[in-house]
């Protein structure tokens, strides 16, 4: 039984930045430090940060007045930002810069009075934050959420000829392409972003798992169940005709999965650390793996800067 590792896999620049913001804020200010929502969607990472003193909450009313709060990599609405300011909270923003780019795009269309369509998953924190960039007081248009092609077919917008779209950054590239095609067919004058809003890390990891699936009869994706991009990786492998399972750690591997399997692919979502992948490899060796090789993949060199206050602390 041979194991093939996808490349790239695991942490992206936005996740690296978000985790580092929490760690450095704790080092700089001490505990408690509050984090609104899981800073990234990975149980192992969140548990580690809890042990360091981070307190995770879902809403700002759970944060004491004047305390320090970190916004997660998924971003927050303008209403949350206003609430934090009104309560005198010290804020460090771990929103991924690629999510911020989408937020700025939504705000720009709002100012022009254009209607806006967001392609995304209802209830996902990134979607809630992006929808919350729409300021009815500063624009006359509306924002709509579509999750699939069926939503496009039944969508009624107020301004079909004054319309734009954007996307959640962690969606399936293939699914998003199909939805965009449906939008363009129904609304021929709709405007889109200059560049695809699916983030570079999402696309690279999906390309890598597609290549992996061509050579394997089983693909294991390391990632937590609430990780959007990790779920898309497992779904993509399945669409390529390969059995695939999303696992939080090596402990979730069922030995029955690897019976009569000759090539097992392993990848990890953008919020899953390499230590979890290492654990999966060790478990596969126990189950009979004879070798591990790694695809060359697409190199990633993206690095996002920390907030200025944390950079200054490093210099000091």
UniProtKB/Swiss-Prot annotation:
GO terms for biological process: dimethylallyl diphosphate biosynthetic process; isopentenyl diphosphate biosynthetic process, methylerythritol 4-phosphate pathway; terpenoid biosynthetic process. The active site is at 126 (proton donor). It is an enzyme of class 1 (oxidoreductase). The keyword NAD does not apply. Keywords: 4Fe-4S, Iron, Iron-sulfur, Isoprene biosynthesis, Metal-binding, Oxidoreductase. It catalyses: isopentenyl diphosphate + 2 oxidized [2Fe-2S]-[ferredoxin] + H2O = (2E)-4-hydroxy-3-methylbut-2-enyl diphosphate + 2 reduced [2Fe-2S]-[ferredoxin] + 2 H(+); dimethylallyl diphosphate + 2 oxidized [2Fe-2S]-[ferredoxin] + H2O = (2E)-4-hydroxy-3-methylbut-2-enyl diphosphate + 2 reduced [2Fe-2S]-[ferredoxin] + 2 H(+). GO terms for molecular function: 4 iron, 4 sulfur cluster binding; 4-hydroxy-3-methylbut-2-enyl diphosphate reductase activity; metal ion binding. Pathway: Isoprenoid biosynthesis; dimethylallyl diphosphate biosynthesis; dimethylallyl diphosphate from (2E)-4-hydroxy-3-methylbutenyl diphosphate: step 1/1; Isoprenoid biosynthesis; isopentenyl diphosphate biosynthesis via DXP pathway; isopentenyl diphosphate from 1-deoxy-D-xylulose 5-phosphate: step 6/6. [4Fe-4S] cluster binds at residues 12, 96, 199. (2E)-4-hydroxy-3-methylbut-2-enyl diphosphate binds at residues 41, 74, 124, 169, 227-229, 271. Binds 1 [4Fe-4S] cluster per subunit. Isopentenyl diphosphate binds at residues 41, 74, 124, 227-229, 271. Its cofactor is [4Fe-4S] cluster. Dimethylallyl diphosphate binds at residues 41, 74, 124, 227-229, 271. InterPro entries: LytB/IspH. Its EC number is 1.17.7.4. Belongs to the IspH family. HAMAP family: IspH. Catalyzes the conversion of 1-hydroxy-2-methyl-2-(E)-butenyl 4-diphosphate (HMBPP) into a mixture of isopentenyl diphosphate (IPP) and dimethylallyl diphosphate (DMAPP). Acts in the terminal step of the DOXP/MEP pathway for isoprenoid precursor biosynthesis. This is 4-hydroxy-3-methylbut-2-enyl diphosphate reductase. It comes from Xylella fastidiosa (strain Temecula1 / ATCC 700964).
